[in-house]
Regions:
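Pre-Walker A-like glycine/lysine-rich segment at the N-terminus of P-loop NTPase domains
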Residues: 1-65
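Short strand-coil-strand connectors
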Residues: 8-11, 101-105, 314-316
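Short, mixed charged/polar active-site loops
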Residues: 14-16, 106-108, 133-135, 317-320
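A short, sequence-level motif marking secondary-structure junctions
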Residues: 20-25, 112-117, 141-145, 323-328
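Conserved P-loop NTP-binding catalytic core
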Residues: 34, 41-47, 51, 60-118
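Conserved ABC ATPase signature
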Residues: 45-50, 268-339
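Short beta-strand segments that buttress and anchor functional surface loops
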Residues: 96-101, 125, 311-313
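Electropositive, glycine-dotted interaction segments
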Residues: 108-267
């Protein structure tokens, strides 16, 4: 889970800015919105409010940028991503750090860079403990050789491999060592270097940036009778004019006609893949594009059941399709799982 992020000299973030998911002791209701890992209470969800140009989009952009750096290196466009509020920021270090949990372990991984030069100046990974202490697993400064925690004792074979990786990486100012340690490297479950894989895998698989233009997402929405009652209760609290949300079954042909062929083919490959993974397949998935909303339910090896939503309005004799609603109303359905 995400614990905390820290951003400095990036887009609209000039000074170091933090977002924390650690729950306040003052929160005593909605216990199901929290998760306890060891002695730390973490929030499952977070909502960011702010006026226009307050930096909300740039927070999302940070997650996209951070993941991209880990996967492929600092992108070309990063040269202009430093905070432009002050002239000196062009040559000033930018800092990025995420604190996460993997299993019951807490990690802090980050790096600093001069974005205008796409030059990495430092990188670090710490394991954090409940008593407030931390252990540096590895760090690097500038183009120097990465240094492993001296307390980590490796078998000779693994030690020799790491020494080669670290020696070869010396002088590298354009790549992250975390990335290098996951480039075709294999780790056993007992390897004392497994933290390289754990942190890398978490970042590339658990950071998912979904924007209004994201064409397809896969969510666990269950629009059966019980969930429809809850959704209708929630929708009443918003001034949308919607009086009722209901589902309507459609055929696979209708689904095919409602979306571009490449998208439909991708969806069906995904459904087929999930069916093949299970001996007795049973799952539901929701697809949400900018103007479409479909649910696919699979029970056994029968043809998938496809439904879409229709909406009744207070002052209309006819129902409306999801694509006929305003963008703001459509975005409400993206938040239903959190609400």
């Amino acid at each position: 889970m995400l614990v905390k992020v820290s951003i400095e000299n990036f887009k609209s973030f000039d000074c170091a800015t933090e977002l924390t998911m650690i729950s306040s002791n003052k929160i005593r209701t909605n216990a199901n919105h929290r998760l306890k890992i060891k002695s730390t209470q973490l929030l499952k969800y977070g909502v960011v409010y702010g006026a226009n140009a307050a930096g909300k989009t740039n927070l999302v952009e940070f997650f996209r940028f951070f993941k991209e750096c880990i996967r492929k290196g600092i992108p070309m466009e990063a040269a202009g991503m430093f905070c432009k509020n002050r002239e000196e920021n062009k040559e000033r270090e930018s800092g990025f750090e995420v604190q996460i949990t993997v299993g019951d372990k807490f990690y802090a991984y980050g790096f600093s860079a001069i974005l205008s030069k796409r030059k990495i100046t430092s990188e670090w990974l710490y394991e954090l403990y409940q008593n407030g202490s931390a252990r540096c697993l590895f760090e690097r400064e500038g183009n120097k050789r990465p240094i492993l925690d001296s307390a980590i004792t490796l078998p000779n074979t693994e030690k020799n491999k790491f020494e080669i990786y670290a020696d070869d990486f010396e002088g590298n100012e354009s790549s992250l060592f975390l990335t290098e340690m996951n480039r075709g490297k294999k780790y056993t479950v007992r390897s004392k270097l497994l933290f390289f894989k754990e942190v890398y895998d978490w970042i590339v698989t658990h950071i998912a940036v979904i924007t209004p233009n994201t064409p397809l997402i896969d969510l666990e929405y269950y629009y059966d009778t019980d969930s429809l009652k809850l959704i209708n209760k929630l929708i009443e609290t918003f001034d949308t004019g919607i009086s009722k949300v209901k589902i309507e079954e459609i055929s696979l042909d209708e689904l095919s006609n409602a979306m571009p062929k490449p998208v439909f083919d991708k969806v069906m490959r995904h459904v087929k893949s999930r069916i093949e993974e299970q001996e007795n397949p049973s799952f539901r998935m929701t697809m949400r594009s900018n103007e479409s909303f479909f649910n696919i339910e699979v029970q056994g090896h029968e043809e998938p059941k496809v439904t879409t939503i229709r909406l009744d309005h207070v002052k209309s004799f006819y129902d409306f399709g999801f694509e006929e609603e305003s963008d703001g109303t459509r975005r409400l359905f993206d938040l239903m799982d959190m609400l």
